[in-house]
Swiss-Prot record:
Pathway: Nucleotide-sugar biosynthesis; CMP-3-deoxy-D-manno-octulosonate biosynthesis; CMP-3-deoxy-D-manno-octulosonate from 3-deoxy-D-manno-octulosonate and CTP: step 1/1; Bacterial outer membrane biogenesis; lipopolysaccharide biosynthesis. This is 3-deoxy-manno-octulosonate cytidylyltransferase. It comes from Francisella philomiragia subsp. philomiragia (strain ATCC 25017 / CCUG 19701 / FSC 153 / O#319-036). NCBIfam families: kdsB, PRK05450.1-3, PRK05450.1-5, PRK13368.1. One of its GO terms (cellular component) is cytosol. Belongs to the KdsB family.
Length: 250
């Protein structure tokens, strides 16, 4: 039987919003909000992987299982790879990476991402996306765009506006029907996750600062489909944090 685990990578020294994992959201730190959201699911286990003693203490105080990792990881995926190795998960097990800055992610989407990987044996990773509905989101580098093939395998992820609409000009109203925003949730097979950590950082991964590009660069498949439910964007900026706080205060 394949066990499905959730690991939440949590780094205190975020580049764009330092300390955001412990930012207060209606009386609770953000990492607790994320953990409680994930806990509504029925997966085998939920673990927080962090390089911060402060986050570890906070998380243990609200009852989470925590594992300390190195502080020099290039990405959350690398951090999770260390965690699953320490935890001794079997290669055939599945791990869902739920970002520690997505307190509003629907449980249905987490379960959907895990099921997608089970249904796509050719893929080593699965993830989700949703159609972009506002033109301004196409040009926001914090909204990662994705293009995928007819079989629902990702072709490329970018902070740029992909696909490019040929003939576009400032006076042209861009069609947004074919633009998709990547939702920052990943599901991996544990055996591949361990291998991922051994792969060199790819040039495109470094250029775009997108960890999933290491998978594509090395010739592996990422399965992707539109999410069952809308997913609010994660907390990357102070403005994002204020928006989330207002939603919890309602």
């Amino acid at each position: 039987m394949v066990n499905i685990h959730v690991v939440i990578p949590a780094r205190l020294k975020s580049t764009r919003l330092p300390g955001k994992m412990l930012a207060d959201i209606a009386g609770k730190p953000m990492i607790q909000r994320v953990y409680e959201q994930v806990a509504k699911s029925k997966f085998k286990s939920i673990i927080i992987a962090t390089d911060s003693q402060e986050i570890k203490e906070v998380a243990e105080n609200f009852g989470a299982k925590v594992i300390l990792t190195r502080d020099d990881h290039e990405s959350g995926t690398d951090r999770i790879a260390e965690a699953v190795t320490k935890l001794g998960f079997a290669d055939e097990d599945i791990v869902v990476n739920v970002q520690g800055d997505e307190p509003l992610i629907p449980v249905e989407n987490i379960e959907q991402a895990a099921q997608l990987l089970i249904e796509k044996p050719e893929a080593v990773v699965s993830t989700l996306c949703e159609r972009i509905t506002e033109a301004e989101d196409i040009y926001n580098p914090n909204n990662v765009k994705v293009v995928f093939d007819k079989n629902n395998y990702a072709l490329y992820f970018s902070r740029a506006s992909i696909p490019f609409e040929r003939g576009f000009s400032e006076n042209h109203q861009v069609s947004i029907s074919e633009f998709f925003r990547h939702i920052g949730i990943y599901t991996y097979r544990v055996g591949f996750l361990k291998h991922y950590a051994e792969l060199a950082i790819s040039p495109i991964e470094k250029y775009e600062a997108l960890e999933q590009l290491r998978v594509l660069y090395n010739g592996y498949k990422i399965a992707i489909e539109q999410s069952a439910k809308p997913t609010p964007a994660g907390v990357d900026t102070l403005q994002d944090l204020e928006k989330v706080r207002k939603l919890f205060d309602v």
